[in-house]
Amino acid sequence: MRFLVAECEPPQAREKRRESVGRSSGETYLEVLHKLAPGAECDRIKPTDSCAEIPGREALTEYDAVFLTGSPLHLWQDSPEARRQIDFMHRVFASGTPSFGSCAGLQVACVAAGGKVRPMGDRREAGFARRLVATERGRAHPLLDGRPASYDAPAIHTDEVEALPEGATLLASNRVTRVQAAEIRCGEGVFWGVQYHPEISLREVAAALRRQSDDLLEHGLARSNADVEQLAQQVDALHAEPNRADLAWQLGLDDQVTVPEYRTRELRNFIEHLVKPTRAKRGR
């Protein structure tokens, strides 16, 4: 199989993430995809960069899947970076290549297909999205195959989908963010996406908490930087020892987050239930 990872991070955010966790969002995706699909050929591009060469429709048809990463990019702002990312997604839809996105990746697909994204205001999901529940349509959708009736997932975002495009299917919600998972069809393309982050490790969750410490204080989710650091240290410790029941209990987490095979379930489902059947239809 041949995969293309499209990094939604602008250059400054990409380097800031590398400083805190050692890799960009696209590099995280590459590592996870190599584990989920050993032997797959994976390329990475950076559509937000002004100097980036964006593949056209025909070039995109040579891939079996396209993955869009998370990012602090605000899709509700008219910026050159946002326009480049949305233009890239238009090409993905036109190519008919199956696509998947997490966090900003979902928001990019939504806007490109005619939906809307907005800032969350004072609400936040920082660290983990709690009590995610599939909709009636979501319970039968292969993206969420194997997920329990209610589950948690890594999540870090300050924007959300305000309105899905026409014809999209809402698959999961919680009390903080209505659109947590969705299927979007546009032109020849099919996109499956989630607002949370099935691709990131607990170590990356801890790093994200540290990067967003000031924002957490501003919105009353922590009283001090020391509070944020204490939480990040617990998450780091659980990453190092995922079988520690005491840390999982203190953080209110179960195996849906602590076990990598469960945490990455949506990515695995996308490859098994959409990418491989589409590849077979194309005679590859």
Q: Model features per residue range: what roles?
A:
Residues 18-21, 80-83, 113-117, 168-169, ...:
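Short, glycine/charged-enriched secondary-structure capping and boundary segments
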Residues 5, 42-44, 100-102, 172, ...:
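A structural signal for short, well-ordered beta-strand segments and their strand-loop junctions
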Residues 8, 115-208:
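Pocket-forming structural segment of enzyme catalytic cores
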Residues 1-86, 91-95, 219-284:
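N-terminal beta1-alpha1 cap of cysteine-dependent amidohydrolase-like domains
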Residues 15-16, 54, 77-78, 110-112, ...:
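Short glycine-/acidic-enriched loop or helix-start segments at secondary-structure transitions
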Residues 27, 31, 107, 158-159:
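Active-site phosphate/pyrophosphate- and oxyanion-stabilizing loops and adjacent acidic/basic residues
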Residues 71-138:
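Cysteine-nucleophile active-site neighborhood
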Residues 176-218, 222-224, 228-236, 240, ...:
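A glycine-centered loop/beta-turn motif at secondary-structure junctions
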